[in-house]
Amino acid sequence: MEKLFNENEGMPSNQGKIDNEEQPPHEGKPEVACILEDKKLENEGNTENTGKRVEEPLKDKEKPESAGKAKGEGKSERKGKSEMQGGSKTEGKPERGGRAEGEGEPDSEREPESEGEPESETRAAGKRPAEDDIPRKAKRKTNKGLAQYLKQYKEAIHDMNFSNEDMIREFDNMARVEDKRRKSKQKLGAFLWMQRNLQDPFYPRGPREFRGGCRAPRRDTEDIPYV
């Protein structure tokens, strides 16, 4: 009896061991298994989310770079096209403007510029020497100044302590200066008179070609112009 009891007792103990061995450690605790599975799922979700987050900023970085490159290329192309078009327009405009200006001014407006100076002034400017550019009033003043200077010098000689010989020399020099001045006047007058005769072939002359003659000028057949 004791042996059978022992055998019966041994059986349940062995069965309990077998049950314990066959059952996994988490089967006895379903709550623990659920918690572990949830943690695993959370970890997997976290890893996926982190991967997505890493990929998203990379994509965001790539997008602006690609967009910036595309914009820069588009702008450069537009600028190049605009410069080419602007250069062609600027080259085309001056020619048209020049033609319009040349065509817009009629011949009647161009001619007055050339005709603005009369022929008489051009001829006179070509024939006048350089000295005649000075006005006549200025020339008269210079002549008067020389005469006044000579008079003042004559009066001052008496006050100076010159000897008789020096006084004679000074008076001779002044006489020479006056003679030169008179001769220069006569030469200029004769030169002007000759110029008048050359300019006017029918200039009135006296009986012996003296100025201011009493007789009227004679006209021979040679003097009459051919009609």
Curated annotation (Swiss-Prot):
UniProt keyword annotations, A-Z: Nucleus, Transcription, Transcription regulation
A cellular component annotation (GO) from this entry: nucleus
Domain of life: Eukaryota
Keyword Nucleotide-binding: no
Region listing for Disordered, in residue ranges: 1-145, 202-227
Keyword Transcription regulation in record: yes
Function of the protein: May be involved in transcriptional regulation.
Basic and acidic residues biased stretches: 18-43, 50-82, 90-113, 120-136, 206-227
Subcellular location field: Nucleus
Protein name: Transcription elongation factor A protein-like 2
Family classification: Belongs to the TFS-II family. TFA subfamily.
Pfam families: BEX
